[in-house]
């Protein structure tokens, strides 16, 4: 049997590239498949600064495990995707066809296209090529279910009612009840024509329209790879299995978090890692005493919100490390905390001194926190972050959601999570739950775990 060759395509955001790269690496490890990860040209140039300004049509880079290739989405030529979504999609589809043709010419034909969130045009390319395609859902299974019911399940009117009434409960099959504050913001917020929000809403809709057509065709169940693990969202996953092959492969976190002797691969991130001695700083702190603060690579705080976060951290009296993508490095808060521009989050979260994670609640961050057993204080901002916050607080019991970006509220939440250690301290229960979920996450992703088995089976049946 010929070796599988998966083409994994993702958009050029760090929060999308990270899980795509980890999935690609796991596919190789699970069954010896050949995997090519393709990213937009601008992201490729940032990941590989030595890449020529004028890329060759079949440019490839190898990091020792994966092969990387750039694709064109037009942004490198100044295209505004929100202003011209049709051209954005056309450029991507054309580029993917060229990539596939190049591999045929080199005797390494693509046998399956795995497309990440927002890139359903890849499914159309796969149909034209006569190869299967698989959606890679980089968010939670619950987020998948909410979006599916909105775009393809006929429940969109409930979301409109929630948008008009914050107290209205949206009840969807197999899911907890949601209020507006818990629902992905793209489904309830304003989306003026021609804006980025409208553009994203359209791309999400096309993903689920593609799935709806595949389900309706009834020839073979469409497959969706999910960055979650079975034990975490058992009922949600089971609720779709009659019509969709739900392949749980998570948590897709750095190998160091789930394996005793991992083989690390090159990071090739879009951002340069801070070279300050923050790990040495962590070494000097007591176990579980440090607050780690990061709002991801996309989420941003207004200046007044940053000041409120700083007030809350200072008022808590606990040492903290704050990763700020554009905030500078150095001492912050009179010696109580340090700021870094960009750090290796997995190393920080897994450090013995870190006892709490103040986070925007992006799914990658939630997955890494759960893998490390670190409870969270959550300040979600948009998209699925608000849904993740609800799940972490109410379903899994591993975090507290701040009601506002305010210093006193942040201090209160930190006290709840890190608490004083009394027998009735709710933080004790939360920390125990976080550790218990950490063990389940590692079990799922480790050798012989449910996610590892699913990956191996997927590689065998990839075409």
Curated annotation (Swiss-Prot):
Catalytic activity: cyanidin 3-O-rutinoside + UDP-alpha-D-glucose = cyanidin 3-O-rutinoside 5-O-beta-D-glucoside + UDP + H(+)
InterPro entries hit by this protein: UDP_glucos_trans, UDP_glycos_trans_CS
Residues holding an anthocyanidin: 16
GO annotation, biological process: anthocyanin-containing compound biosynthetic process
GO molecular function: cyanidin-3-rhamnosylglucoside 5-O-glucosyltransferase activity; quercetin 3-O-glucosyltransferase activity; quercetin 7-O-glucosyltransferase activity
Lineage: Eukaryota, Viridiplantae, Streptophyta, Embryophyta, Tracheophyta
Native source species: Iris hollandica
Family: Belongs to the UDP-glycosyltransferase family.
Encoding gene per record: 5GT
E.C. number(s) listed in UniProt: 2.4.1.116
Binding site for UDP-alpha-D-glucose: 345, 360, 363-365, 368, 384-385
Domain of life where this protein originates: Eukaryota
Protein's name according to its UniProt entry: Cyanidin 3-O-rutinoside 5-O-glucosyltransferase
Record bears the keyword Glycosyltransferase: yes
């Amino acid at each position: 049997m010929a070796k599988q060759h998966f083409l994994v395509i993702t958009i050029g955001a760090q929060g999308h590239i990270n899980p795509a790269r980890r999935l690609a690496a796991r596919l190789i490890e699970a069954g010896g498949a050949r995997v090519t990860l393709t990213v937009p040209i601008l992201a490729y140039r940032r990941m590989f600064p030595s890449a020529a300004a004028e890329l060759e049509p079949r440019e490839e880079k190898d990091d020792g495990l994966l092969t990387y290739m750039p694709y064109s989405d037009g942004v490198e030529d100044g295209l505004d995707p929100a202003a011209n979504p049709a051209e954005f999609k056309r450029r991507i589809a054309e580029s993917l066809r060229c990539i596939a043709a190049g591999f045929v010419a080199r005797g390494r034909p693509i046998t399956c296209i795995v497309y990440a969130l927002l890139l359903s045009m890849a499914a159309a390319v796969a149909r034209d090529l006569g190869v299967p395609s698989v959606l890679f859902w980089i968010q939670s299974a619950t987020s998948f279910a909410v979006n599916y019911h909105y775009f393809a399940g006929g429940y969109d009117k409930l979301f409109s009612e929630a948008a008009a009434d914050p107290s209205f409960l949206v009840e969807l099959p197999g899911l907890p009840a949601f209020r507006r504050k818990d629902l992905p913001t793209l489904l309830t917020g304003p989306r003026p024509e021609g804006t980025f929000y409208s553009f994203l809403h359209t791309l999400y809709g096309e993903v689920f329209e593609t799935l709806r057509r595949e389900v309706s065709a009834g020839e073979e169940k469409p497959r969706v790879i999910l960055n979650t693990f079975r034990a975490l969202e058992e009922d949600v996953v089971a609720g779709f299995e009659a019509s969709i092959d739900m392949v749980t492969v998570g948590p897709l976190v750095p190998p160091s978090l789930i394996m005793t002797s991992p083989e690390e691969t090159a990071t090739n991130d879009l951002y340069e890692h801070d070279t300050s001695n923050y790990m040495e700083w962590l070494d000097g702190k007591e176990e579980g005493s440090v607050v780690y603060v990061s709002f991801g690579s996309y989420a941003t705080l207004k200046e007044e919100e940053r000041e409120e976060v700083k007030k809350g951290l200072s008022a808590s009296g606990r040492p903290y490390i704050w990763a700020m993508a554009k905030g500078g490095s150095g001492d912050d808060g009179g010696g109580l905390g340090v700021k870094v521009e960009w750090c290796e989050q997995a190393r920080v979260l897994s450090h013995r001194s870190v006892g709490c994670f103040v986070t925007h609640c992006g799914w990658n961050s939630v997955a890494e926190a759960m893998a490390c057993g670190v409870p969270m204080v959550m300040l979600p901002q948009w998209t699925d972050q608000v849904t993740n916050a609800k799940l972490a607080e109410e379903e899994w019991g591993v975090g507290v959601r701040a009601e506002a970006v305010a210093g006193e509220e942040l201090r209160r939440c930190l006290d709840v999570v890190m608490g004083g250690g009394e027998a009735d301290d709710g933080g004790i229960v939360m920390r125990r739950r976080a550790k218990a979920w950490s063990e389940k996450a590692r079990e799922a992703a480790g050798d012989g775990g449910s996610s590892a088995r699913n990956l191996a089976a997927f590689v065998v049946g990839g075409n």
